[in-house]
């Protein structure tokens, strides 16, 4: 799937827009920005869809280039966030002396800081966003090193510079960042942000630049190597959320955090267990999946096989996959018989001739880099068109066998799923009146089950007879050994307060309040 299609897959349409209204300082030295919301009606959906889609195009593009906490927050610095349509959370930073203000995405899925340059003359998008002017800053230092961040339909480019970066009340000295001088296309023109501040590990930083977060620690600006996210999903609240640098804010979560170790530096990636629908195992992650906690992704992205099962369970719209139906019609009974004969599931599709490998191949994770993406294409060239459909059918049949379904019921079930495959455009509508009948979807992390109720994974636009509802799940397929992979975006982080513990290299989740 290309970046444009992937962008649509992450589009979210909800009902409000936030603007900064006031600034305030707390006695403990933290910094907050007051927020308010401007409600949007469903008639604005097309316009907001376009903007959100382009923002997610950028997120996917940038990502494709890159390879016992408690107490009060008195020693922490708090940055409030602006919630744009529940699709993205923004905050304000400043660069230079005197400070030049920018609205940025605080993104745990990347590691660079970039903003438009005052030297960006030939990209229309630069004229619609705040631009950094080095000549106006007494703390500016020249680097001269060129920078380019590639994405599916082009790239943004510019050069590195150094200056003071203000985040809340913290001033990070001599921070390396990218001044962009070329921002082609509509992606950046319609974006609601000026730039991006990455909170991932340095391993995925373009140009090996030191991330802002690293310099906060090196310069002794915070006492604890921890930051945490609270994303407010309450449509009636004026607060969009907040990041706490240096700790956590106890008033935004209840109970204890469940921590899991980071398994691969770069992204905040960890091992995840089974995914459950109404308490029943989907079987897909029985032997483990990887997951990334990503504040820059709006929805929950996961393997098509599981998202299709969720679609069916919640009655989501989808598309009919003729390839899927053909495989089920011709090989469904054979796959069922082989599973009943206890054939190793990973070998079934190669055994019946639909896949040219036996499930033990290795393919680079497309999320890491453009080069890896090309390698993935060439590696997967061996696969026949029916191979992915066969692999999904194996998963679906296994899940039904575990529930002791009859053979006739199993064949009907997988045929029904073939008619509810996730749309290439990513949008899956659901019936708002059926929310109370939809199942809980759960994720197993660190041995604990984290539930999402229908009202938490379904995004509602408008009220009354004009209300529209969209599923918060979208498809993303990453093959082994990097996958299967889930990206736990804002839909998940909105329900669960998230701690990014840099010192112990772990991620923690607790119920948000």
From Swiss-Prot:
Disulfide bridge partners, by residue number: 120-126, 285-289, 324-418, 349-390, 355-387, 432-469
Peptidase A1 domain: residues covered: 89-510
Expression sites by tissue: Expressed in seed pods and dry seeds.
GO molecular function list: aspartic-type endopeptidase activity
SMART domains: SapB (SM00741)
PROSITE patterns: ASP_PROTEASE, PEPTIDASE_A1, SAP_B
GO biological process, one term: lipid metabolic process
One protein family per Pfam: Asp
EC number: 3.4.23.-
Positions annotated as propeptide: 25-71
UniProt KW Glycoprotein keyword: yes
Locations listed in the record: Vacuole
Keywords attached to this entry: Aspartyl protease, Disulfide bond, Glycoprotein, Hydrolase, Protease, Repeat, Signal, Vacuole, Zymogen
Residues carrying sugar: 404
Source organism, top-level taxon: Eukaryota
Functional note: Involved in the breakdown of propeptides of storage proteins in protein-storage vacuoles.
Record family assignment: Belongs to the peptidase A1 family.
Protein name, per record: Aspartic proteinase A2
Native species: Arabidopsis thaliana (Mouse-ear cress)
Source species taxonomy: Eukaryota, Viridiplantae, Streptophyta, Embryophyta, Tracheophyta
Gene: APA2
């Amino acid at each position: 799937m290309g970046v444009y299609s992937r962008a649509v897959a992450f589009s979210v349409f909800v009902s409000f827009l936030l603007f900064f209204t006031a600034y305030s300082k707390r006695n403990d030295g933290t910094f907050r920005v007051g927020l308010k919301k401007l409600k949007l009606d469903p008639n604005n959906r097309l316009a907001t869809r376009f903007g959100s889609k382009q923002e997610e195009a950028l997120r996917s593009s940038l990502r494709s280039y890159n390879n016992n906490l408690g107490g009060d927050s008195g020693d922490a610095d708090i940055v409030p966030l602006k919630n744009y349509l529940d699709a993205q959370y923004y905050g304000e930073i400043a660069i230079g002396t005197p400070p030049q203000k920018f609205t940025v995405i605080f993104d745990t899925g990347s590691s660079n800081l970039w903003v438009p340059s005052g030297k960006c003359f030939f990209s229309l998008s630069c004229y619609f966003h705040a631009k950094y002017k080095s000549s106006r800053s007494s703390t500016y230092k020249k680097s001269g090193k060129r920078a380019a961040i590639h994405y599916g339909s082009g790239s943004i480019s510019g050069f590195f510079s150094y200056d003071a970066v203000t985040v809340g009340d913290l001033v990070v000295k001599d921070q390396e960042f990218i001044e962009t001088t070329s921002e082609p296309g509509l992606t950046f023109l319609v974006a609601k942000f000026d730039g991006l501040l990455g909170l991932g590990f340095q391993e995925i930083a373009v140009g090996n630049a030191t991330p802002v977060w690293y310099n906060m620690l090196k310069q002794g600006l915070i006492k604890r190597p921890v930051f945490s996210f609270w994303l407010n999903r309450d449509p009636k609240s004026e607060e969009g959320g907040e990041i706490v640098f240096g700790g956590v804010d106890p008033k935004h979560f209840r109970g204890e955090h469940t921590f899991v170790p980071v398994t691969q530096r770069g992204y905040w990636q960890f091992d995840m267990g089974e995914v459950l629908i109404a308490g029943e195992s989907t079987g897909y992650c029985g032997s483990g999946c990887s997951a990334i906690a990503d504040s820059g992704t709006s929805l929950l992205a996961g393997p098509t096989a599981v998202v299709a099962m969720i679609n069916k369970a919640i009655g989501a719209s989808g598309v009919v996959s003729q390839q899927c139906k053909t495989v089920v019609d011709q090989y469904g009974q054979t796959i069922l018989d082989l599973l009943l004969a206890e054939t190793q599931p990973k070998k079934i599709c190669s055994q019946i001739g639909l896949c040219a490998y036996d499930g033990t191949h290795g393919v680079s994770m497309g999320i890491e880099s453009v080069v890896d993406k090309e390698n993935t294409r060439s590696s997967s060239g061996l696969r026949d068109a029916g191979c992915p459909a066969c692999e999904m059918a194996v998963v679906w049949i296994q899940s039904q066998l575990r529930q002791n379904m009859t053979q006739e019921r199993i064949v009907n079930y997988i045929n029904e799923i073939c008619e509810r495959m996730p749309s290439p455009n990513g949008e899956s509508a659901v019936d708002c009146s059926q929310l109370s009948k939809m199942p809980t979807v759960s994720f197993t992390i660190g041995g604990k089950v984290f539930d999402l109720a229908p009202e938490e994974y379904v995004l509602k636009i408008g009220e009354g007879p004009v209300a529209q509802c969209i599923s918060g799940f979208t498809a993303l397929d990453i093959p082994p050994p990097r996958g299967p992979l889930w990206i736990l975006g804002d839909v998940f982080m909105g329900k669960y307060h998230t701690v990014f513990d840099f010192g112990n290299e772990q991620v923690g989740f607790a119920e948000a309040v």
